[in-house]
Curated annotation (Swiss-Prot):
<keyword id="KW-0119">Carbohydrate metabolism</keyword>
<dbReference type="GO" id="GO:0006094">
    <property type="term" value="P:gluconeogenesis"/>
</dbReference>
<dbReference type="InterPro" id="IPR009164">
    <property type="entry name" value="FBPtase_class3"/>
</dbReference>
<comment type="similarity">
    <text>Belongs to the FBPase class 3 family.</text>
</comment>
<comment type="pathway">
    <text>Carbohydrate biosynthesis; gluconeogenesis.</text>
</comment>
<dbReference type="InterPro" id="IPR029052">
    <property type="entry name" value="Metallo-depent_PP-like"/>
</dbReference>
<keyword id="KW-0378">Hydrolase</keyword>
<protein>
    <recommendedName>
        <fullName>Fructose-1,6-bisphosphatase class 3</fullName>
        <ecNumber>3.1.3.11</ecNumber>
    </recommendedName>
</protein>
<keyword id="KW-0464">Manganese</keyword>
<dbReference type="GO" id="GO:0042132">
    <property type="term" value="F:fructose 1,6-bisphosphate 1-phosphatase activity"/>
</dbReference>
<dbReference type="Pfam" id="PF06874">
    <property type="entry name" value="FBPase_2"/>
</dbReference>
Length: 653
C-alpha cells in the first residue's frame, strides 16, 4: 500500500470525517469500478454535413437499434423495430406524424411508454443510479427514477406503475415524457464521444454541428486541419481567414460565413467587382456539388470574390514564408517565378504556361506586397472573424474540449499523422530555437495553437503562434496536413497535372507496419501490444480494396466520409468506431438520405458492424482511465481508514 502525507490525510478527513463515511465511500468506489465499461463512440471528418452527423449521433452508430433487438427481438417485427428506433432518434417530429395517422392515440402512448421504460432500464443497467439521475431532465427526474429502478412486472407494483403512466397520459404529458425517455436512451447508449477532427470544411452546417456538440453530455475533440484553419481565423490570422473564405467560395458555401456566422462579405464583393470587373475569372468558377440554383450574376460575382481572396492569400503566405526561414518553404514562393509579360511560371526548373495571367493587384517588382485596398479589405475581414460572437463561442469550445492528440483508455487518437522519415524515425522541427519530434512536437504544436488564441494582438508571440497555426494547415512537418506541399496555386493556374502532386508523408505507407504503430504507441507512453491508434483525415477507398483496419488491427482509420464529394471515391459514407465493454467494433455506413425521409419512411443509415477485437473478460470501469483514478482514490481512503483505526487521526462525529 502506498504511503501518503499526513497533511493530505487531514484534508481528506474534512470530507470523510468518520470511519463509517470513509468505509461507505470505499464501498461505493469499488462498486463503480465493477460496473461494465461505458460505450465510447468515435466519429471523424464530419465536414459540415449536419444531417448525416445528426443521424449517426442519434442512433449511436446503430447501438440504439441493436439494444431494441436485444429486448424486443422476439416480440417486434422489423417494421415495428424501425418505427420505435425512429421515434427514439426524432421523438418530437415522429410523434407529430403518428398523431396524425393513429386512431387510438391513448393505446399507442401506453404501449410506447412501457416499451421505452423497459428499454431505458436495460441501457441504464451499466450505470450507477447517481449517473442516470444526472442525465434525467429535471421535470421528470422523480417519476423516471421511480419507473426505472423497480420491477414494474411484480404484482404489488404493477398497479402503481399503471397509475403513474395513466396520469401522465390523462394530464396531456405523454409526448413530453416520451421525448424525455427517448433523449435519455440516446444519452445512455453512448457514454463518451470522440470527434477525431474536422467538423469544418466544405459542408453547409458546421455551426449546427458545433451547437449540437456543445450540448452533448461527454466528449473530447482532436483538432483537424480544417478546424485549425477556422481556429486561426478566429484568433486573428489574416492568412487563415483568407483560406477559409477561399474554400467557402470554391464550394459555393459562403452562406456559412454570412448567414450562419454573420460575417459580412460585402467589402470583398465590392472590391472584387471593382478590381476584377472585366475578368471572367474562368478558373475560379465555384464548384456546385449540391446543384444549388444560383443565377449567372451570382456565380460571376462569387468567382470574382474567389479570385480576389486567393491572390490575397498567396501574398500573405509569401510574407510568412519569407519571415519564417525555419519553415523551409521557399519552394512555395511562387509569385516571384512568374513572367508577367509572357504569362508563364518556372516550377522546379520547368516553364509552364499560366491558364490565367490577369493580376491587376500584383507588382512584379514586389509580388507579395498587398495593395492599400487589399490591406484594408483583409483587415476588415479579420476583424469580422474576431468580432463574431457565435464563431468565438464555437472556437472557445474547440479549445476547451480539444487537443492535438489524446491518449484515452489505452488508445491514441489524432486526426492527421505523426510525421515520419522513410526509415520510420520521427521528423524533427525547430520551434523557438529548439528541435522537437514525435510526441514532443505535437505537444509544442498544441501549446502554440493555444497561444495564437490567447496572446495579445500585436505581440511577436501572437504573430509567431498564428504563423504556426497556418503552418499546421499547409506545412510539410505538420501533423495535421501530412503532405510535402499544398499545391493550391498550381491547381488554379497550371493545367499540367504533374504540378498538382502533393506527396504524402511516409507515415501513410508506414502505418500499415505493425512495428511502426507499436513504436508510435510507445512514444505516447501506451502499451504497444494492447493499444490502438485511431486516425482520421484520409478517406478509405474501400472500392479499390483499401481496408480501414491496418497493421494487424493496431491502426484504425475512421475518416467518417460524411463529405458527399468522397462517396464515389470511397463507395461508402465512411466509418465510425465503437469501443464498449465487449471490445472494439468498426461500423461502415452507407450514405444518408434526408432527415425527412428517415422520419416519414423510417429509413436509417445502413450500417455494417465488424468486430475488431473481442474481450475474453468483459471490460470493467476499473480497466479504464477513470477506473485508475477511482482506484487511486480508494487507496487514499483506505490509508485514511487505517489512520482512524490506528489513532493517527480522530473521527469528527
Amino acid at each position: 500500500m502506498k504511503t501518503i502525507d499526513m497533511k493530505y490525510l487531514r484534508l481528506l478527513a474534512k470530507e470523510y470525517p468518520t470511519i463509517a463515511k470513509t468505509a461507505t465511500e470505499i464501498i461505493n468506489l469499488e462498486a463503480i469500478m465493477n460496473l461494465p465499461k461505458g460505450t465510447e463512440h468515435f466519429l471523424s471528418d464530419v465536414h459540415g454535413e449536419y444531417s448525416a452527423f445528426e443521424q449517426v449521433l442519434r442512433n449511436g452508430s446503430g447501438v440504439v437499434k441493436r439494444k431494441i433487438r436485444d429486448i424486443f427481438g422476439a416480440e417486434l417485427d422489423d417494421a415495428e423495430i424501425n418505427s420505435l428506433s425512429t421515434l427514439i432518434y426524432y421523438p418530437e417530429e415522429k410523434m407529430d406524424l403518428i398523431a396524425s395517422e393513429t386512431e387510438d392515440l391513448h393505446a399507442w402512448y401506453r404501449t410506447t411508454l412501457f416499451r421505452l421504460i423497459e428499454l431505458c432500464q436495460y441501457v441504464a443497467s451499466k450505470y450507477t443510479r447517481s449517473k442516470v439521475r444526472k442525465a434525467m431532465p429535471e421535470d421528470f427526474a422523480y417519476i423516471l427514477e421511480e419507473l426505472l429502478h423497480e420491477n414494474y412486472n411484480e404484482d404489488d407494483k404493477k398497479l402503481y406503475y399503471e397509475e403513474i403512466l395513466q396520469h401522465i397520459i390523462s394530464l396531456g404529458r405523454a409526448e413530453e415524457f416520451i421525448s424525455a425517455l427517448s433523449l435519455l436512451i440516446q444519452q445512455l447508449v453512448v457514454d463518451h464521444l470522440h470527434i477525431v477532427g474536422d467538423v469544418y470544411d466544405r459542408g453547409p452546417y458546421p455551426d449546427k454541428i458545433m451547437d449540437t456538440l456543445m450540448n452533448y453530455h461527454s466528449l473530447d475533440f482532436q483538432w483537424g486541419n480544417h478546424d485549425i484553419l477556422w481556429m486561426g481565423a478566429a484568433s486573428g490570422s489574416r492568412v487563415c481567414a483568407a483560406n477559409v473564405i477561399r474554400i467557402s467560395a470554391r464550394y459555393l458555401n459562403l452562406d456559412i460565413l454570412e448567414d450562419s456566422y454573420g460575417i459580412s462579405l460585402r467589402p470583398l464583393a465590392l472590391f472584387a467587382d471593382e478590381v476584377y470587373k472585366d475578368d471572367p475569372c474562368t478558373y475560379f468558377q465555384p464548384k456546385n456539388e449540391e446543384n444549388i440554383n444560383y443565377s449567372n450574376a451570382e456565380i460571376t460575382q462569387i468567382a470574382r470574390m474567389h479570385k480576389a481572396i486567393s491572390i490575397i492569400q498567396f501574398k500573405l503566405e509569401g510574407e510568412i514564408i519569407k519571415r519564417r526561414k525555419e519553415f523551409d518553404m521557399n519552394h512555395r514562393l511562387l509569385l516571384q517565378f512568374i513572367d508577367y509579360k509572357k504569362g508563364t511560371i518556372q516550377l522546379k526548373g520547368k516553364e509552364y504556361q499560366l491558364l490565367d495571367n490577369h493580376f491587376p493587384t500584383i507588382n512584379p517588382e514586389n509580388p507579395y506586397e498587398l495593395t492599400d485596398a487589399e490591406r484594408e479589405l483583409i483587415g476588415k475581414i479579420t476583424a469580422a472573424f474576431k468580432n463574431c460572437r457565435r464563431l468565438q463561442k464555437h472556437v472557445q469550445f474547440l479549445y476547451s474540449k480539444g487537443s492535438m492528440f489524446l491518449t484515452y483508455n489505452g488508445n491514441l487518437l489524432y486526426h492527421g499523422c505523426i510525421p515520419l522519415h522513410k526509415d520510420g524515425t520521427f521528423m524533427e522541427m525547430k520551434l523557438r530555437g529548439e528541435k522537437y519530434a514525435g510526441r514532443a512536437l505535437l505537444e509544442q504544436f498544441e501549446i502554440l495553437t493555444r497561444e495564437a488564441y490567447v496572446r495579445p494582438t500585436g505581440t511577436k508571440e501572437k504573430k509567431y503562434a498564428c504563423d504556426i497555426v497556418w503552418y499546421l494547415w499547409t506545412g510539410a512537418i505538420s501533423s495535421l496536413f501530412g503532405k510535402s506541399e499544398m499545391t493550391t496555386f498550381e491547381r488554379y493556374f497550371v493545367a499540367e497535372k504533374e504540378t498538382h502532386t502533393e506527396e504524402k508523408n511516409p507515415y501513410y505507407k508506414l502505418r500499415n507496419n505493425e512495428l511502426i504503430c507499436k513504436q508510435i504507441l510507445e512514444e505516447f507512453e501506451l502499451d504497444g501490444e494492447c493499444g490502438h491508434i485511431i486516425n482520421g483525415h484520409t478517406p478509405v477507398k474501400e472500392g479499390k480494396g483499401e481496408s480501414p483496419i491496418k497493421a494487424s488491427g493496431k491502426m484504425l482509420v475512421i475518416d467518417g466520409g460524411f463529405a458527399k464529394a468522397y462517396h464515389k471515391e470511397t463507395n461508402l459514407a465512411g466509418y465510425t468506431l465503437l469501443f464498449n465493454s465487449y471490445g472494439l467494433q468498426l461500423v461502415s455506413h452507407q450514405p444518408f438520405t434526408t432527415k425527412e425521409d428517415a422520419i416519414k419512411n423510417e429509413t436509417d443509415i445502413l450500417s455494417t458492424r465488424q468486430v475488431i477485437e473481442m474481450e475474453i473478460n468483459r471490460k470493467r470501469v476499473r480497466d479504464t482511465d477513470i477506473g485508475a483514478k477511482l482506484s487511486e482514490q480508494a487507496e487514499d481512503l483506505k490509508l485514511l481508514l487505517d489512520a482512524y483505526r490506528n489513532g493517527l487521526l480522530h473521527e469528527n462525529r
